[in-house]
């Protein structure tokens, strides 16, 4: 594991990041475009230098290497992207308007952030609502399509009534809702949650790990909804901030993720590693996230996020 301990809060350096992403993408055999990456860093320079930056990958060889900034202040990521040509007018006027609508809730205090693909550039926008918010507010925002709203009753029946984040994927045309699910997780709960996406229940080994690492008070649970069809394509369970690996065995990860763990640098004073189990009708995989710089742990603690350690 790459761990670098420093006394001062970690700061973003573009030259260092370019070296790191170039080396990491090569190490895990992920597609990479230097031109696209430099463009993204230039367009959102303020957010990279003043926010928090982290890595994200999956356990599937050949999948994208993603990086993300979390903003510490309200910004209009949609207008920035549209002005720079990172979003087509069509996307900016449809999915972009949805992001802007959610950001306008609660007197415009929600904070937008962005995900980037190391090859394709900007792929997703996030909105943090400043805490746990009622599902009614989120689904009732202007412009939320009926394909998303139609699931409200089912979510509430499963106890999914509080949302902290949403995300809009510009490339996949999907919306993610991030709930606080009641813990401790039970097999019955996991079976019902997986059924949202037409997925089988977790295997015994998967459930044992999920029960061990998901916070027993409550944990982050996400659904991914296709905007056109309204289908729930995937659900995900997030174990945020795994314990030190030297102190406690982590959930099982494959060789692809082991290489990521080996080569992905983190400059935060306290490293954050997270694993997420993703289930869908046709796709089941594991996601892994790691802090890069900007001090992620204090940020997510400030959100009231329940952690695994």
UniProtKB/Swiss-Prot annotation:
rRNA processing recorded as keyword: no
Enzyme nomenclature, EC number: 2.5.1.-
MF GO annotations: prenyltransferase activity
SUPFAM superfamilies, alphabetized: Prenyltransferase-like
Signal peptide: none
Keywords, comma-separated and alphabetical: Prenyltransferase, Transferase
InterPro entries for this protein: Aro_prenylTrfase, Prenyltransferase_CloQ, PrenylTrfase-like_sf
Recorded superkingdom: Eukaryota
CDD domains, per database record: PT-CloQ_NphB
Annotated S-S bridges: none
Protein purpose: Prenyltransferase that attaches isoprenoid moieties to carbon atoms of aromatic substrates in an enzyme-catalyzed Friedel-Crafts reaction. Shows specificity for dimethylallyl diphosphate (DMAPP) and does not accept geranyl diphosphate (GPP) or isopentenyl diphosphate (IPP). Prenylates the artificial substrate 2,7-dihydroxynaphthalene (2,7-DHN), as well as dihydrophenazine-1-carboxylic acid and 4-hydroxybenzoic acid at lower levels.
Family membership: Belongs to the aromatic prenyltransferase family.
Note: The gene is not located within a recognizable secondary metabolic gene cluster.
Protein name: Aromatic prenyltransferase
Organism: Sclerotinia sclerotiorum (strain ATCC 18683 / 1980 / Ss-1)
Lineage: Eukaryota, Fungi, Dikarya, Ascomycota, Pezizomycotina
């Amino acid at each position: 594991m790459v761990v670098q301990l420093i006394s001062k809060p970690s700061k973003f350096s573009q030259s260092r990041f370019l070296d790191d992403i170039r080396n990491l993408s090569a190490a895990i055999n992920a597609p990479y475009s230097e031109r696209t990456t430099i463009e993204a860093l230039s367009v959102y320079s303020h957010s990279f230098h003043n926010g928090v930056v982290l890595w994200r990958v999956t356990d599937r060889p050949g999948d994208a290497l993603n990086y993300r900034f979390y903003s510490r202040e309200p910004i209009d990521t949609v207008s920035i992207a549209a002005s720079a040509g990172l979003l087509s007018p069509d996307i900016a006027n449809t999915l972009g308007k949805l992001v802007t609508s959610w950001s306008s809730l609660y007197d415009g205090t929600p904070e937008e952030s962005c995900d980037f693909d190391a090859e394709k550039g900007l792929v997703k926008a996030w909105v943090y609502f400043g805490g746990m918010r009622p599902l009614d507010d989120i689904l009732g925002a202007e412009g939320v399509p009926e394909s998303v709203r139609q699931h409200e009753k089912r979510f509430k029946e499963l106890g999914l009534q509080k949302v902290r984040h949403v995300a809009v994927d510009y490339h996949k045309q999907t919306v993610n809702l991030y709930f606080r699910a009641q813990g401790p997780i039970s097999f019955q709960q996991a079976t019902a949650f997986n059924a949202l996406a037409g997925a089988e229940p977790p295997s015994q080994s998967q459930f044992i790990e999920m029960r061990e690492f998901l916070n027993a008070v409550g944990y982050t649970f996400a659904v991914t909804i296709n905007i056109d069809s309204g289908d729930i394509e995937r659900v995900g369970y997030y174990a945020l901030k795994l314990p030190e690996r030297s102190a406690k065995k982590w959930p099982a990860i494959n060789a692809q993720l082991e290489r990521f763990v080996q080569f992905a640098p983190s400059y935060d004073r306290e490293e954050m590693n997270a694993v997420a189990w993703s289930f869908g009708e046709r796709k089941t995989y594991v996601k892994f996230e790691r802090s890069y710089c900007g001090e992620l742990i204090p940020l997510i603690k400030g959100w009231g996020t329940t952690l695994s350690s």
